[in-house]
Amino acid sequence: MFDKQKNRYIRVELASPDQIRNWAERTLPNGEIVGKVTKPYTLHYNSHKPEKDGLFCERIFGPIKSGICACGKYHGFVKNLPEVKFCKQCGVEFTDSKVRRYRMGYIQLAYPATHIWYLKRLPSHIATLLKMSLKEVESLVYCDLFLPRPIIKKPNLLKVKKLFNYDDQLWKETLPRFFSTRSFESFQNREMATGGDAIHKRLSSLNLQKLIFQSYNEWEKLSLQRSTGNSYEDKKIQRMKDIIIRRIKLAKQFFENNIKPEWMVLSVLPVLPPELRPMIEINQGELITSDLNELYRRVIYRNNTLIGFLNKSNSTPAGLIIYQKRLVQEAVDALIDNRIGNQIMKDRNNRPYKSFSEIIEGKEGRFRQDLLGKRVDYSGRSVIVVGPSLSLHQCGIPKDMAIELFQPFIIRDLINCQLAPNLRAARSMIQNQEPIIFKILEKIIKNHPILLNRAPTLHRLGIQAFQPILVEGLAIRLHPLVCGGFNADFDGDQMAVHIPLSLEAQAEARFLMLANSNLLSPANGEPITVPSQDMLLGLYVLTMSCKQGIYIYNEQKLKKKIPYFCNYIDVITAYEKKQINLHDPIWLKWYGNLRGTSSTKKQKLFEIQCESRGTRRKIFENWHFCENIRNRKFTIYLFTTPGRIIFNQLLEQSIQATVRI
C-alpha cells in the first residue's frame, strides 16, 4: 500500500527491467513465481471469469471478490496478517479485492522495443545521445536499416564482401548461392544488428562521463570558430552548438539520477492493474472494455508470434522474423502513444484507440482529473472582479465567504473570550451574524494570509498569497496588475480561495508567495505585473486631451478661454468643484526648467508677443514662457489637462515610495 509518511511526492522517471519485475512478481507458498502475463485473453466468453495468466488473471492481480478464490471457495481474510493464505488448487490469494487497484503484471518481450517517448518526442533523446539523425534512428528501430557488428577476430559482412571481390566466373556463380542459404542468414544475424536490439547495444555501450567530456571539447572547438559571413554556415554552426548543449544536459541528468540510457529500450513491459483498465458487463452479457486492454492484447499476440518464429528460426524466413519484430515495436508504440506512432491502431469503427499517454495527460487525464482535482477543506470559489482601490498584496473577500472559511477560528476566539459558552452557541451567533462576529473576523484576517489559485496552474505564479479585505457582494476583488501571473481577466473567470493552516504554511505564504514579492516572471525574468487591457485604456482616457479638429468643438474652443493655474492644488480644487472637466485644456505654471519636458526643441514657434517694458512672450504648441531684456526666462506655462496632472501626481507618489523602500 502507499505509505503517506514515507512517500511524500511522486516522480516520473525511467525504470529498469529488474525494477519492473520487482513491481509485479510474487512468490507463492509452493515456490511458484507469478506476475508474468503470457496470454492475450481477458475473460472467459461463457463464465465471464478471468483467464489464467491473462490480462485479468486472479493469480497475478488478486481476487475479484474479497476472500474468494477462482474456485469459488471462501476463506476470509485479515488485513495486515504476516502469513499470506493461498488456495492450493488455483493459487489465488485470500485477500481484499482492492489489491487489484495497485498490483501490476509484466510482459517479457521477445525482442527489445524502443520507448516512443524518447524516440519521437522532439527533441529525440535517443538521437541526441547517439549523435545520429532522427531519420536514421527511426529507420534502425523499424528494421529499415542494418548496422554492422564489429567483433574481434571475426570478419563482419562488409569485410567478407571485400574478400570475395573477384572477377572469376566461378565466384560470380557461387556468391549468390551463398548469400541465399540458411547459413548466411545465421551469419547475418550474428554480424548485423537492427531494431530495438541495435539501439539497446549502442546505448549500453555509452560512457556518460566520457560523452560529456567529448561534448565539451566539441563545444570549445566550435566556439573558437569565427563568423564565416555566410548565414547558412553560421546557422549550421549554431545548430550544432545547440545539439551539443542538449546532449551535455541530457547526459548529466542521466548520470546524476543514476539512470542508464539503455533503459529507454524496453525488454520488460509493465501491465497496469486491472481496476485502472476495467472490463464491465452491461445488458445481456455484453462487455465493454478499456482501449488499453485491446492494445495490451495486440502486444501479447504479436510477441507470442515472434517467440514462435524465434523457436523455429531454422524453418522461418529471416525476412518474416524481421517483419514480426517491427510489428511488436509498432504494437508497443500504440500502447504507449497511439498518436505519434508509424501505424495508428483503430477499432472496427475506425476510431483510434486511446493509449496510455492520452489517459494520463490533459485536463481530463489521470493526474489533473483524479490526483490534482480533489476538493479540499477550508477552500471556496467565486468570480473575480476588479478592485482598483486595493493594494497589490490585497484582495477583497466577500463577507459570507470569509465567515464560512474562518468559522473554526471565529468559534475558537468566541469561546476563548467567553463570548459564547459552547460550540452550539458560537455557531448560533455566527448564523445570526451578530456585529461582534465581524470585529473578530477582521482581527483574524489581519494576520492570516490566504491563497488564490486560478486553474490551470501552469507555473508557480498560478497560486499567490494575499492579505484579505472584507468586501460586500459575492465576488472576489483582485488588483488588476496581478492578472498577468494568473493569466486571468475580468470576463467571468473564477478563482479558488485556500487558507494555509499550519504556521509553516502561513510563513511560506507571507514571505515567499505574496503578490508584491512576485513581480518578475520566473521563466525569463521580465516584469509580469505590467498594465494591460483595461488599465491601458484607463490611462489613455485619463491623459488624453480634448478633441480638436472637429467643427462642433472648434466653436466652443473659440468662445471659452483657456484658464491659467499656479500649481497642482489649484487644478485639483477646480476639478473637484467641477469648474473644469478632466480633459479641458489648461495652462499650468512650471517652476522648473524645460529639460524634463519632451520634444521642446521640435515644437514650432507660433507667436511672439512684445510688451512695452521690453519683455517678450514666446508661444509654442504645448508651452509658452516670458523673457526679459537679457533673454532670461522668468515665467513658464505648460499646456496640459487635469487628467495628466492627476496621473503625474500618482506617478510621483509611486516613485517616491519605491525610493524610500
From Swiss-Prot:
Keywords: Chloroplast, DNA-directed RNA polymerase, Magnesium, Metal-binding, Nucleotidyltransferase, Plastid, Transcription, Transferase, Zinc. SUPFAM superfamilies: beta and beta-prime subunits of DNA dependent RNA-polymerase. GO terms for cellular component: chloroplast; DNA-directed RNA polymerase complex; mitochondrion. Its EC number is 2.7.7.6. One of its GO terms (biological process) is DNA-templated transcription. The keyword Ligase does not apply. Zn(2+) binds at C69, C71, C87, C90. This is DNA-directed RNA polymerase subunit beta'. It comes from Chaetosphaeridium globosum. The gene is rpoC1.
